Amino acid sequence: MDLQLTTNSTDSGDRGGSSNESLQRQPPSQYSPAEVAGLAAVVSFLIVFTIVGNVLVVIAVLTSRALKAPQNLFQVSLASADILVATLVMPFSLANELMNYWYFGKVWCVIYLALDVLFCTSSIVHLCAISLDRYWSVTQAVEYNLKRTPRRIKGIIVTVWLISAVISFPPLISLYRDPEDDLYPQCELNDETWYILSSCIGSFFAPCIIMVLVYVRIYRVAKLRTRTLSEKRTVPEGSSQTENGLSRPPVGAGPSTAAAAAASLRLQAGENGHYHLHHHHHHLHHHHHHHHHQLRKSAELEDIELEESSTSENRRRRRSREEAAARKGSRGFSFSFSSTKGGQSAGAGSRLSRASNRSLEFFSTHRRRKRSSLCRRKVTQAREKRFTFVLAVVMGVFVVCWFPFFFTYSLYGICREACQVPETLFKFFFWIGYCNSSLNPVIYTIFNQDFRRSFKHILFKKKKKTSLQ
């Protein structure tokens, strides 16, 4: 928001001669040519960097499979607001600062001020909506994730922009305007105390308080659930379960014990030389459902375990260990039986082999399917947790960038000259707030590997294509 702590108004009776004298004494620009060139270069670089960085964010979310989650549409809308700040607000703020007056006319002054307040307000309301989205995904993991569709997220984004407009536009009705015949007109907001305080509270302090309280609540819930999850994971020594619900044998068990435990099949010879294959289907069915229930509870708790990390290298190592164990178990699977009739034993052995192979194939397929589902869920959970941390950093940086400006501006509204900071310092706080629009892509690049990979893919893929051509 291009706000001036001082105004250049003069009494209507003195406008004949004193006004012209003061305007002749006052230079059009308060900076030397070298300072003008330096400031123009720095701010121009900031504008270009903001546009390019946020365009990359939009392209990454819309094209990367890893960023296809509906909630990432919030980042698209937030990046769009930053792009609009860099294109429709910052260039005119720079010109107004360097020229020391408003050159672009009264109509564009009204539009410029309205857009400036709107984009600043929408940024923090976006962050407030994102914090609520993260809170619901933590406290209502299963139910809210089912409702979190692209259509619902788009509806929330439209609501965010409407709320921002409602907060921003009404106070702009009473803008301060210099007389039309002023040689150096100024484009300034209402300087009255009620407007300064209402705009500061509505555009910054109220959403900021909501955002901070929500994230404190997220942290507390996550910490409590993580402690509960660690207690649930505690199991007695010497006992464990496989992914299909069967009990694993002790570490020192022999091959025959391992085979019997893995297949849960038993062969008994009757008095008449016939063989009976007893498949403990009911026992396995019971164990499977019991373990599935435990897995579901564990998965729900893992939704809010912020400390969990899931990397592709760890998944490959775990998968290779499980496949090696499965191969070892299948090799160790053996049957021993005795019979008085060789033909009968050969036939029974053949039937037993086919039955055991079908059983092993069923459990192996079921286990692979369940392992794949759990792996996908864990990857999604880990990505959610990493991005929750990234968004907490984004919100913290936003508050740090904009708090000095809104704090000093609200102080000026309360006690005027007694609390007024030096004009140079106030302008510095004002431009630090604008710098925030360029920082989100940097934060995504540093703290989120999905964005980092996507940015590299977008930039270097295009370079490779041009080099090949």
Curated annotation (Swiss-Prot):
User: Which keywords belong to this entry?
Assistant: Cell membrane, Disulfide bond, G-protein coupled receptor, Glycoprotein, Membrane, Receptor, Transducer, Transmembrane, Transmembrane helix
Compositional bias of kind Acidic residues: 301-310
- GO terms for molecular function, please? alpha2-adrenergic receptor activity; epinephrine binding
A single GO BP term for this record reads: regulation of smooth muscle contraction
Keyword check for Glycoprotein: yes
Write one Pfam family the protein is assigned to.
Answer: 7tm_1
Q: Which family does it belong to?
A: Belongs to the G-protein coupled receptor 1 family. Adrenergic receptor subfamily. ADRA2C sub-subfamily.
The protein depicted here goes by the name Alpha-2C adrenergic receptor
**Natural source organism:** Didelphis virginiana (North American opossum)
